[in-house]
A protein has these predicted regions:
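Charge-dense, helix-prone N-terminal extensions
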Residues: 1-163
């Protein structure tokens, strides 16, 4: 075999290996593609304003409607809780999931169990959330169902996050 052919074969093998083990799952790659689409849509919409809040609301409700149960019911309920607890937050999608932002920066988000094939949904908070408690505090919570107890805790967390 000539050195040129050997090099080409090696390059092809490396490419195949990189495609198989690039470190991201199919679900993660899909989420990144959704995030890129969200950024393009935001750029087309122009500067932030009331119109964008309405657009964000529509985007979030569409994502929630596309979810399967029980994630859809939890996401709908969380959407209502967050809107009532922190009306200053603007709904938007973030990596294809419902999120809520203050001054354009995500404060909290919902991640459906089906999105990443996990056994629970997640309510997460970003670094802009005011949840600090000493040197250690939780920033994500697993959700299997929403009862009155969980809802009360979420209300308190969201209010604290935006305080």
């Amino acid at each position: 075999m000539s050195p040129k052919k050997d090099t080409q074969k090696s390059a092809k093998s490396t490419t195949a290996i990189n495609k198989e083990s690039n470190g991201f799952t199919d679900e993660e790659r899909a989420a990144m593609k959704e995030r890129a689409q969200e950024l393009k849509a935001d750029a087309r919409r122009g500067p932030r304003g009331k119109k964008d809040k309405a657009d964000g609301e529509g985007d979030v409700l569409a994502k929630i409607a596309a979810m399967q149960e029980p994630d859809r019911a939890m996401a709908k309920r969380l959407h209502a809780i967050i809107k009532a607890s922190a009306p200053a937050l603007s709904p938007k999608t973030w990596y294809g999931m419902p999120a809520y932002a203050k001054d354009g920066k995500v404060v909290c988000f919902f991640q459906s169990a089906q999105k990443f094939n996990t056994r629970y949904a997640t309510l997460g908070f970003s670094e802009t959330a005011n949840l600090d408690e000493g040197a250690l505090w939780p920033v994500a919570f697993a959700l299997k169902e929403l009862t009155a107890t969980e809802e009360a805790r979420i209300v308190a967390l969201v209010k604290k996050a935006v305080s």
